[in-house]
Amino acid sequence: MIDRYKHQQLRIGSVSPQQISAWAKKILPNGEIVGEVTKPYTFHYKTNKPEKDGLFCERIFGPIKSGICACGNYRVIGDEKEDPKFCEQCGVEFVDSRIRRYQMGYIKLACPVTHVWYLKRLPSYIANILDKPLKELEGLVYCDFSFARPIAKKPTFLRLRGLFEYEIQSWKYSIPLFFTTQGFDTFRNREISTGAGAIREQLADLDLRIIIDYSLVEWKELGEERPTGNEWEDRKIGRRKDFLVRRMELAKHFLRTNIEPEWMVLCLLPVLPPELRPIIQIDGGKLMSSDINELYRRVIYRNNTLTDLLTTSRSTPGELVMCQEKLVQEAVDTLLDNGIRGQPMRDGHNKVYKSFSDVIEGKEGRFRETLLGKRVDYSGRSVIVVGPSLPLHRCGLPREIAIELFQTFVIRGLIRQHLASNIGVAKSKIREKEPIVWEILQEVMQGHPVLLNRAPTLHRLGIQAFQPILVEGRAICLHPLVRKGFNADFDGDQMAVHVPLSLEAQAEARLLMFSHMNLLSPAIGDPISVPTQDMLIGLYVLTSGNRRGICTNRYNPWNRRNYQNERTYDNNYKYRKKKEPFFCNSYDAIGAYRQKRINLDSPLWLRWRLDQRIIASREVPIEIHYESLGTYHEIYGHYLIVRSVKKEIICIYIRTTVGHISLFREIEEAIQGFCRACSFGT
C-alpha cells in the first residue's frame, strides 16, 4: 500500500518477542516503563474511566481526549514551554488522542503458546518444518502428551526419548510421585516438556541449512528409485517428494527473511489499539463492545490464574498446572481464530464471537472492505441493463445517481447563472427537482466522462470510461458490445460509477480509457467487442426477408412450404403494384413499417440511384410491362428498370425489405462516421 511515508507494500509475517515488546513498551518521562496489560478490566462502572493497566488504560494507550489526562488536567499539545509532558499523578502523557489508533500493548504469557495459524492452518508450517504428524503435535500442544529428551546435552535420569503418553500403565503411578516431590520443578524443566514449550524447544534446536541439505539428499534418493509397480507405494513416494520440496522452500523462506522458527510460538501476545476494538455507548446508556475485548479478557483471566498457580507450584498439583496451560492455549486460539479447532465459542445469546481472523478475512474484513475496496466519494453503484440504442462510447445514468454524483457541479452552475444565491438555495432547488436543474445537469454531463468498473477488475478493460446521458429508471444502461471487456452479463450484475475529478484523471479517461478506444484485447490482440449470439440472431431475422421470389407457382419450394394449402392456378403471373408497394426513399419505407402498413419482411420496391452494374448487366428481364404513355417496366428477379419511349432509363427500383433497408442505413452511417473521423484526424 502507498501512504504518506511512501511505503509501497504491506507484508504480514512472524515477529520476534523483542519486536512485540518494542511496539508496545514506552518509557514515561519519569523513567517508568509501561505497556503490559495485566488486568482484564475495561472501564470502571462508576466513573466510566479506563481501568489502570486494563485493556483501555490511558497510561498504556494514550489519553481518550487530546491533552487531557485521567485526572482531568489539561496541557497544550506540542507546546515546548509546557512542562512536564505527563501527569505525575496518573502517568498519562499529554499527547493527541489519535495515538490510541496505533499504540499497542502486550500480554506477558505465563507459558509459551503456539500460534494457531502456523499449527492448524493447512499446510501446517510447524508440522512441515519439524517433519512430524500434525496429530502428534496437537497432542503435545494441548498437553495430551509429554516430550522427554535431554536438554542442553546434559546427562539424564530418565530413559525416555520422544513423546510418551501420561496415561500409560508404566508411568501412571510413578510420575504423580514426582509431581508432589520437592525439587520436581527442576527435574521437569530438565527432562520433561509438554505444551507449546516443547514445540518451542524443538524449533529452537533446528538448523535450517542442515534441514535443506538433508531434505535435498533424500529427495534425490527418492528420485533415483524406479517405480515399484505398486500404485500405493508409488503414490507414497510422490507425496514424500512433494513434502520435501515444501519443507525446503519453507526453510529457505525463514533464512531469506531472517525469521526464526521459534517465533511461531508466542511468549508475548500483542494487544490491539483500543480504537480498533472500541466500546460504544448506545441509546439508553447501554454499552456495545467488540468481541475481541471479551476474548482478550478471557486470555488475561486464564493467564493470571496460571501465573498464580506457578508462583505457588510447590503446593499445586502438576496436573492442574498442565490443565491451566491448556486453557491458556485454547483462549489464545479463540482470540486468533475462533472455531478453527471445531466448535466455535459463543456468548450468552448463542452468538459466535468474532475473532481476529474474522475481522481481517473475507469480503467484509479489514483488508477487502476498508483497504483494498474502500468506498470513495463521487461514486455510485447500480444494476446494469442493455441499452442497444446507445453509441459504443455512451452509457445511461439514472437521474437519481447522476444528480448525486454531479451535485457540486450543478450547484456551481446554478450560482454562476445567478439562479441561486448560495449553496443552501441551490440544494433546495435540487431537492425540489426543478426543470432548470436537469438542464444544467445535462450541460455538466456533456463535458464530463465517468468511469464504470465491475469487480473483480482482473485486467485493464475491467474499468472503462463513458460519456454519460440521463435515462429513466434506476439501472445503468450499457451498450451490449462492451459487455465482454467487463466480463459482465445482463442478468443482475452490478457496476460501480466513478467521477474523475482532476484534470489528469479526465484526460486519461478521454485519451486512454474510452470504450470505443479499447476494441482489442490487451492480452492477445483479438477483437473484444464482437457480436453476441442474440445479435447474430437479430441480424438474421432482420435480413431473412420473404424468399418466395417474384415468381409464384406451385413448383417454387418456398411457396410450397409457406402456402401448402394454397394453389396457384395463374401460370401467367403478372406483376401487380398492390401486393408490393413502391417507395421513393428509405424514410417512406420505414415510416410505413412504423405505421404497421407493411411488415419487417414484406417485399417492397425502393427507388434506387442509377447503378452502372445494373445498367451494364446482360440479364434478360422476366417480364416487360408497357404503360399507356409509352414508358415500360423491365422486371428482373431483384430489380426493375423504368424506361422512356426512347429507351432511356428513367429510374431504377430494387426489390428489398424494411429489414435490409435498416441494416444498410446503419452500415452507411458507420462508414460516414469513420470517414469523418479519418478526415478530422488528418
Curated annotation (Swiss-Prot):
Binding locations of Mg(2+): 489, 491, 493
Transmembrane segments: none
Superkingdom classification of source: Eukaryota
SUPFAM superfamilies tied to this protein: beta and beta-prime subunits of DNA dependent RNA-polymerase
E.C. code: 2.7.7.6
Residues reported to bind Zn(2+): 69, 71, 87, 90
Catalytic activity field: RNA(n) + a ribonucleoside 5'-triphosphate = RNA(n+1) + diphosphate
InterPro entries attached to this UniProt entry: DNA-dir_RpoC_beta_prime, RNA_pol_asu, RNA_pol_N, RNA_pol_Rpb1_1, RNA_pol_Rpb1_3_sf, RNA_pol_Rpb1_clamp_domain, RNApol_RpoC1
UniProt KW keywords: Chloroplast, DNA-directed RNA polymerase, Magnesium, Metal-binding, Nucleotidyltransferase, Plastid, Transcription, Transferase, Zinc
UniProt cofactor note: Binds 1 Mg(2+) ion per subunit. Binds 1 Zn(2+) ion per subunit.
Any single GO CC term annotated in Swiss-Prot or TrEMBL for this entry: DNA-directed RNA polymerase complex
Cofactor: Mg(2+); Zn(2+)
Biological processes annotated in GO: DNA-templated transcription
Pfam families: RNA_pol_Rpb1_1 (PF04997), RNA_pol_Rpb1_2 (PF00623)
Cited function: DNA-dependent RNA polymerase catalyzes the transcription of DNA into RNA using the four ribonucleoside triphosphates as substrates.
Subunit composition and interactions: In plastids the minimal PEP RNA polymerase catalytic core is composed of four subunits: alpha, beta, beta', and beta''. When a (nuclear-encoded) sigma factor is associated with the core the holoenzyme is formed, which can initiate transcription.
Full protein name: DNA-directed RNA polymerase subunit beta'
Gene this chain is encoded by: rpoC1
